Amino acid sequence: MAEAAVASTVTLPVTGGWTKHVTCRYFMHGLCKEGDNCRYSHDLTSSKPAAMMCKFFQKGNCVFGERCRFEHCKPTKSEEVSNPQMLLLSSTPPPIDPECSESGPRLKTQDWANAAEFVPGQPYCGRAESVDVEISIPLIEELNGDATTDKEELRKQLCPYAAVGECRYGVNCAYLHGDVCDMCGLQVLHPTDSSQRSEHTKACIEAHEKDMEISFAIQRSKDMMCGVCMEVVFEKANPSERRFGILSNCSHCYCLKCIRKWRSAKQFESKIIKSCPECRITSNFVIPSEYWVEDKEDKQKLIQKYKDGMGRKPCRYFDEGRGICPFGANCFYKHAFPDGRLEEAQPQRRQTGSSSRNRNSRRTQLWDIIDERESTGSLDNDDEEMVTFELSEMLLMLLAAGNDEEVTDSEDEWDLFHEELDDFYEIYL
């Protein structure tokens, strides 16, 4: 009994301290929560832990950076080349003795009773099927062939970096560096693809023509002087005022601010302020433009572009078919239903009746429309002149709709319209 007690006292320290010879794997990564109370060893000098490489760093997308607890090191080239082959070879069964392999096909048709006898120390050949060692060699060659094919495909594609500037890889780039385009000076022309070369050349020529048009427009506009303020429009201190006001029926130059101020004057008659300050030719509206336009054909294109731009905006009075637009077919805005259908133009019907009560009621409708416009907010500067022209046409239409006489175009009617419109809406006529 005494000997057993002594033996037990001797063996206790051994059973309790063997863990101190094992390095704590949590401490190796800095994650041990036990600290000094840990049963395992925290001494790294006696242990050589295997380096755990960060697989995300090898793929180039480790978000922890320097704070990552795994090792950031790129695999060597020998590892990159050998790893696929090692995985491929390890997945194939080991080579078998030819004598054993010969019996493999026969085992498919023979009974298990005739299987080869198991001999300790030698590979068992009873259930093993014949494996052709030559199969693994074409697989490796196929792997290398796929890599070669990928490189060949990359060599057929233009380098995206060289196409927009400079490629830092130079001659070592895996992509193809195209020929330099004479128009844009970039390496974007494929050496062998003729269709790509022709398409890019065509696109370059179109872009060059647009740039030339802008250059000519700037050259034509840089010295133009406003006929009211006598300042060069392109040299105005406020950049927002460097815009031209193109009159629809006149070729005199004015800045947009001055011509709108001229057309908003109240001390002159409407025909005077609607006319050009120099030649007195009447223009229905003013078109804002960044560049000066004088040629008649270019001016028509500008007017059409201006109307097309307004035609893409939905009419607030039509309201996708829920409302009624007082301008009807003469409205420059878009009359479209929710499903995309456009409103069909309706023929105008002439109403009879010459009583002053009917005429006054139609005038009241006009001022109600102006009040509604004023309550919803002011228009954009680009829309003011066109809306003014629309309102003037509607006024004449309403004045003429109440009788069978000729259309009234007196100065009193027009001045009344002009004064009320300025008071309610502050639009430049």
UniProtKB/Swiss-Prot annotation:
Its EC number is 2.3.2.27. GO terms for biological process: protein polyubiquitination. The keyword Ligase does not apply. It catalyses: S-ubiquitinyl-[E2 ubiquitin-conjugating enzyme]-L-cysteine + [acceptor protein]-L-lysine = [E2 ubiquitin-conjugating enzyme]-L-cysteine + N(6)-ubiquitinyl-[acceptor protein]-L-lysine. SMART domains: RING (SM00184), ZnF_C3H1 (SM00356). Residues 343-362 are annotated as: Disordered. A zinc finger (C3H1-type) spans 18-45, 48-75, 153-180, 309-338. It comes from the Eukaryota. Pathway: Protein modification; protein ubiquitination. The keyword GTP-binding does not apply. A zinc finger (RING-type) spans 226-280. One of its GO terms (molecular function) is zinc ion binding. Disulfide bonds: none annotated. Pfam families: MKRN1_C, zf-CCCH_2, zf-CCCH_4. Keywords: Metal-binding, Repeat, Transferase, Ubl conjugation pathway, Zinc, Zinc-finger. Residues 348-358 have a biased composition (Low complexity). Residues 181-208 are annotated as: Makorin-type Cys-His. CDD domains: RING-HC_MKRN1_3. PANTHER family: E3 UBIQUITIN-PROTEIN LIGASE MAKORIN-1, MAKORIN-RELATED. This is Probable E3 ubiquitin-protein ligase makorin-1. It comes from Takifugu rubripes (Japanese pufferfish). The gene is mkrn1.
